[in-house]
Amino acid sequence: MSYLQESNRKAVTVTSLQAMRAAGERIVMLTAYDSSFAALMDRNGTDVLLVGDSLGNVMQGQKTTLPVTLEHIVYHTECVSRGTTKALLVSDLPFGTYGTPEQAFHSAVRVMQAGAQMVKLEGGVWLAPTIKFLVERSIPVCAHIGLTPQSVHAFGGFKVQGRGDEAAAQLKADALAVQDAGAQLVVMEAIPAGLAGEVTRLLAIPTIGIGAGLECSGQVLVMHDMLGVFPGHRPKFVRNFMDGQTTIDGAVAAYVAAVKDGTFPGPEHTFA
């Protein structure tokens, strides 16, 4: 089945994501960092484009996302917004830019003015007051729980989260807290597939998985990972969609179709 953008395809909005969840239609998200790739992903039916602080890894060659600044995100958001017509544009708030609700608001205003339609922040229960502060000021929020890369040093490395009863209970508490604070989307990274399914059923808002199994409302991958460009370690949850394709358009279309059809992620891409 083709999911190529048609002229009558409506622009994706925060409210239409909720409608997709209610209808059982899986949400497709990819990272994007420039206008050309944004346009390519958009015309192939990607629902959400994420200007991720992963640009530190794949664009700048950094070992972590921590060196990424707000100015970097603003610049890449401006670039991506120029190539986007239908997809919803979400931008990360980078490390150190949302330590207080007031700081988060000023950071979010910068990226919204650059073209973002939603901001993504990493954190759970502790972040709820900040999310509430932003939502009350008309800033849509996507929360990111589980493995949060900005906390890599606190975690002692990039490790699967939510294993064990206590950790699973904490992740559920995080999910409910960000939802209750007003988040309209939740990314869950590197958690057991069964737990991700429980959280997805527990919430009334869409969940987006990356290394979180098939039961999430949608999936996200870093563009470079999806295209088989691995500058370092290849995560377990990554599939190279360039395999069997001759063009990047073909690879993106294959990714969109695999997410929509529920053939990605497979068991080999998930954690127990």
Curated annotation (Swiss-Prot):
Q: Looking at the record's lineage, which domain of life comes first? A: Bacteria
Pathway the protein acts in: Cofactor biosynthesis; (R)-pantothenate biosynthesis; (R)-pantoate from 3-methyl-2-oxobutanoate: step 1/2
The annotated active site, in chain numbering, is: 189 (proton acceptor)
Q: Which reaction does it catalyse?
A: 3-methyl-2-oxobutanoate + (6R)-5,10-methylene-5,6,7,8-tetrahydrofolate + H2O = 2-dehydropantoate + (6S)-5,6,7,8-tetrahydrofolate
Q: Name one GO molecular function term.
A: 3-methyl-2-oxobutanoate hydroxymethyltransferase activity
Which positions are annotated as binding 3-methyl-2-oxobutanoate? Answer: 53-54, 92, 120
Q: Which GO terms describe its biological process?
A: pantothenate biosynthetic process
Localisation per UniProt entry: Cytoplasm
Q: What is its EC number?
A: 2.1.2.11
Query: Which class of enzymes does this protein belong to?
Result: transferase
**Which cofactors are named for this entry?**
Mg(2+)
Can you tell me which residues bind Mg(2+)? 53, 92, 122
Give the protein family.
Belongs to the PanB family.
The molecule here is called 3-methyl-2-oxobutanoate hydroxymethyltransferase
Gene name in the database record: panB
